[in-house]
Regions:
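Generic N-terminal targeting/processing segments that precede catalytic cores or assembly contacts
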Residues: 1-109, 133, 242, 249-291
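Conserved active-site and cofactor/substrate-binding residues in soluble primary-metabolism enzymes
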Residues: 37-49, 63, 89, 93-96, ...
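Glycine- and small hydrophobic-enriched segments that form the cores of compact globular domains
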Residues: 86, 113-120, 132, 136-137, ...
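Acidic-glycine-rich active-site phosphate/pyrophosphate-binding loop
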Residues: 88-105, 140-159, 204-212, 267
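Conserved phosphate/anionic-ligand binding catalytic regions in large, soluble enzymes, centered on
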Residues: 108-126, 170-175
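Alpha-helical support elements that line or immediately flank enzyme active sites
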Residues: 124-135, 183-188
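Glycine- and acidic-residue-rich phosphate-binding/metal-coordinating active-site segment common to enzymes
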Residues: 145, 151-164, 169-178
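Functionally critical mobile loop/hinge segments
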Residues: 181, 185-291
């Protein structure tokens, strides 16, 4: 049984009265892709690595090799410590963790690509922050990770999850949808709400370009992880209120794939357009080449 659409996934879950992670594990077992044991083992290892990346990133101000980043997480932590934020403690944690992991990535630390290295801070920051503040067990976090993986897997059947093919909508955008679905599940949302949250997250980042300054996964990638982690929470919040996307999730994925085809190659990880060709970016590139 190969699951290729969100509609098919929802129908199977409802028919069998199963959760998304249960259906996807069964599907992979039947197809010979993986056993339930190995799926959960891989998710457990990923969760361990994600926590390590957070803990390391929170303590470090070491600059990246380029010198363009490395202290964003520390600055945010310092500002949150002044108790002037509009965000709740959990939202503060989500933003901070997203930056911590993303900065670990540019320091060449160990991260989990979920679905890509450039979007590595979004899924773990949302899952782990919510889990820590709401007594969510490790098993439930693993279930959430498997659900997030299922979401990414279905999207990837229509559009490769790479900035060079689909722009950043296919990286940070899909990561945000994965995080939103995982969060909605942890909050007790039903299958329809989970899939709706995916659609809500995706349709509001359509056309997001991949235009890395100096061709490095730093500017705007690191800060974008923090923004789209909060975007995931917004999608979950709307879905939990039963605010339904008028465009079905599968059609949104189709629109994303079409948008990727229409997008100029200059805006798909080439560093030849968008932010990468601003005056300041060109100057940074020039200075970098002189080092």
């Amino acid at each position: 049984m190969r699951i290729t659409t969100f509609q098919q996934l929802e129908e199977i879950c409802l028919k069998r009265n199963k959760n998304i992670y249960e259906v996807m594990m069964t599907s992979e077992t039947h197809s010979g892709e993986n056993t339930e044991y190995h799926t959960r083992l891989q998710a457990t290892r990923s969760l361990f690595a994600m926590n390590n990346a957070i803990n390391t990133g929170l303590k470090s101000t070491e600059p990246s090799i380029s010198g363009m980043s490395g202290d964003n997480c520390a600055k945010l932590q310092e500002n949150f410590g002044k108790n002037k934020s509009l965000f709740t403690p959990t939202l503060q944690k989500i933003m901070t963790y997203a930056l911590a992991i993303s900065e670990e990535n540019v320091r060449m630390g160990t991260i989990v690509a979920c679905p890509t290295a450039g979007s590595c801070g979004i899924v773990p920051s949302v899952i782990i922050s919510y889990a820590q503040d709401n007594n969510i067990s490790q098993d439930e976090q693993i279930n959430a990770l498997i659900t997030a993986g299922a979401i990414g897997k279905i999207v990837a059947l229509k559009l490769p999850l790479a900035g060079a093919v689909g722009g950043c909508q296919a990286e940070c955008g899909v990561a945000s949808a994965m995080a939103s679905g995982a969060l909605t599940q942890m909050r007790g949302g039903n299958v329809s709400q989970i899939i709706n949250s995916v659609g809500l997250a995706l349709k509001n980042i359509l056309g997001l370009t991949c235009d890395p300054v100096c061709g490095l996964v730093e500017i705007p990638c690191i800060k974008r992880n923090a923004f789209l982690a909060i975007h995931a929470v917004t999608a979950s919040e709307l879905a939990m209120a039963d605010i339904v996307s008028m465009i079905p999730t599968d059609e949104i994925v189709d629109a994303m794939a079409q948008t990727a085809q229409l997008m100029s190659p200059l805006l798909k990880e080439s560093a030849k357009g968008g932010l990468a060709k601003t005056k300041t970016a060109i100057e940074l590139e020039r200075n970098k080449s002189m080092v």
